[in-house]
Amino acid sequence: MKYKSIMLLGTASSVGKSTVAAAFCRYFKKKGYRVAPYKALNISLNSFVTKDGDEIGRAQVVQAEACEIDPKEYMNPILMKPSAGFKTQVIVRGKVHCTMDAYKYKELNKYLKEKAKEAYDDISNDYDLIVLEGSGSCAEINLRETDIANMHTAKMADADVILVSDINRGGVFASIVGTIMLLTEEERKRVKGVIINKFRGKREFFEPAMRQIEEIIKIPVLGVMPYFDLDIEEEDSASIKLRKGNGKGIDIAIVRLPHMSNFTDFNSLGRIKDVCIRYAENPKDLENANMIIIPGSKNTIDDLIYLKESGFKEALINESSKGKLIFGICGGYQILGEKIIDSLGVEGDIREEEGLGLLNIVTSFNKEKTTKQVVAFDLEGNEVSGYEIHNGESVPTAKENIWIKEQNGNVLGMKNKEQNVFGTYIHGIFDEGDFGEKLINKLKKELNIEESNDVNYKDYKMSQYDKLCELLEENIDMAYVENLIRY
């Protein structure tokens, strides 16, 4: 049986649309619907590679997990990845389409709308109910002509809209009323309800204000989602939740690169008992860490130069000489090497840059982008898995320091001779299997901290989605929402 799509739009960026959409996905899945997520256009450096080798935004991966289905490219047909110099890499249906100047977006608009519609038709054929998510604010009147992800999608899908607003940042009533007022009459007719998100306090004291806002906008407030402390992946790095330390346990410092991408690579480490993860904003932040991670980067050479100019290079080399564990992922792996060569100008005008010299690899960028899921093995025969997203190839200059290889011999990771510096192209390496837990337990053993045996990360995430669904059912009128999806 087919149902009408339902769309979640926001009064602003970071109001919680992605998380509420994940909650809707989990709710409908548990109710027995064949449900899937869809976001026409996503702007994010935080991406994932599907089983088919297609690249999409992580937000739709989270929502697909909540639906207990495999992520596919048609769930996020357009992904834009900002890079240096006001350039944007445009990924269409999982593959790189072009890299363009940001101001030339309008020239691609018609083509992107066609691709978004094509993907929506495909996903609608495969599933009975689609939970749609918008992007940023749905009332940016200067962007109405080129809109793809918001009311354009609602109209394309003939979907009713639920408006999400964030009370935690203040001004929630003005943002709701202002958003409704800036919509056209046709657009306002689509808005069938409002969800107020991230509420702190007792709801009974808030009820009179909810009734007042309903009188003003003539649209029902479906409920108030409380501010909660669940571990649901966030879409952008500005809102990532890092666990602060208390001076005990394992302290992991993430070097905060200016063009950091795929920050979710280390989320799973933060759930392990007696582990704190934090950003290192300056070189001194590395001194007390037990482990240092250099994450992925959308502009590896620029970030490498930043490490040199900010004093991080000297600090990292110094910490390495003390035997401290240093781990590089993708761009971080390339940075740890001897040299990066960009003869084709893939990232910019700099053709060659000396690396930190902590790993024996030389990286050469090329135009072709590698996107695939991988299963590989370390030196001890332990299976490691995840996905690759990168330009270029890293060639070992000391084969005795190879650490991770695929069965076909392709090298995906290196270590140093002292075995305290490691690097790999594999995103999500800490998420799958027990690799991350083994690594942390090794550190705990060295520091005489009790080892842990934590729950499987996939099971842990499912438990978080279930708790999110419970919050939705307790606080939002989902019977009303279910009536909206019936023809």
UniProtKB/Swiss-Prot annotation:
Keywords: Cobalamin biosynthesis, Glutamine amidotransferase
Protein species of origin: Clostridium perfringens (strain SM101 / Type A)
GATase cobBQ-type domain mapped to chain residues: 249-435
GO molecular function: ABC-type vitamin B12 transporter activity; catalytic activity
Higher taxonomy: Bacteria, Bacillati, Bacillota, Clostridia, Eubacteriales
Gene3D superfamilies with a match to the protein in the record: 3.40.50.880, P-loop containing nucleotide triphosphate hydrolases
One of the protein's GO biological processes: cobalamin biosynthetic process
InterPro entries reported for this sequence: Class_I_gatase-like, CobQ/CobB/MinD/ParA_Nub-bd_dom, CobQ_GATase1, CobQ_N, CobQ_synth, GATase_3, P-loop_NTPase
Function (record text): Catalyzes amidations at positions B, D, E, and G on adenosylcobyrinic A,C-diamide. NH(2) groups are provided by glutamine, and one molecule of ATP is hydrogenolyzed for each amidation.
Known pathway: Cofactor biosynthesis; adenosylcobalamin biosynthesis
UniProt family annotation: Belongs to the CobB/CobQ family. CobQ subfamily.
Gene name for this UniProt entry: cobQ
Active site: C330, H427
Pfam families: CbiA, GATase_3
Descriptive protein name: Cobyric acid synthase
